[in-house]
Amino acid sequence: MPRVELEIPEDVDAEQDHLDITVEGDNGSVTRRLWYPDIDVSVDGDTVVIESDEDNAKTMSTIGTFQSHIENMFHGVTEGWEYGMEVFYSHFPMQVNVEGDEVVIENFLGEKAPRRTTIHGDTDVEIDGEELTVSGPDIEAVGQTAADIEQLTRINDKDVRVFQDGVYITRKPNRGDA
């Protein structure tokens, strides 16, 4: 009967609604559905308990995965997750703007139509000249937003050694922090 108990940090509140675990802190809130057969996840006072009646390799690995997800949620609502990105161009000066819940890149390789991508979840995108900072409490939403921005400037059918324009991830969060 494997059982893992995770201590809830002081400034964090955790609630359970059926299969969903919601963690709230100073930096926001994150909700995640944690379900797997024969694994129970519950909030018991100031701890989150992950337990199972089964004792096989798949169940043990899933318990470890759930433990990592919950630790990432705790880290996200207390300190947050942050990606650093940099705008690089050599041919045409591109402009990167945030309009509502979208990131808009104009004049990429001289294109007339702007390229757009959505900002996921509670993620904030800040632009300071050629530097972008993507931050928020949910590691998956922050990472997906950064990846979408990077993929938005992907160049096809041209020599990537010559056309190096784009927005690139230059700094990732240290996942060992959680």
From Swiss-Prot:
Single GO biological process annotation from the record: cytoplasmic translation
Signal peptide: none
Coiled-coil zones: none
GO cellular component: cytosolic large ribosomal subunit
Superkingdom field: Archaea
Keyword ATP-binding: no
Assembly with partners or alone: Part of the 50S ribosomal subunit. Interacts weakly with protein L13.
Stored InterPro entries: Ribosomal_uL6-like, Ribosomal_uL6-like_a/b-dom_sf, Ribosomal_uL6_a/b-dom, Ribosomal_uL6_arc, Ribosomal_uL6_CS2
Source organism per UniProt: Haloarcula marismortui (strain ATCC 43049 / DSM 3752 / JCM 8966 / VKM B-1809) (Halobacterium marismortui)
Function (record text): This protein binds to the 23S rRNA, and is important in its secondary structure. It is located near the subunit interface in the base of the L7/L12 stalk, and near the tRNA binding site of the peptidyltransferase center.
Protein name listed in UniProt: Large ribosomal subunit protein uL6
Alphabetized UniProt keyword annotations: Ribonucleoprotein, Ribosomal protein, RNA-binding, rRNA-binding
GO molecular function list: rRNA binding; structural constituent of ribosome
Family to which this protein belongs: Belongs to the universal ribosomal protein uL6 family.
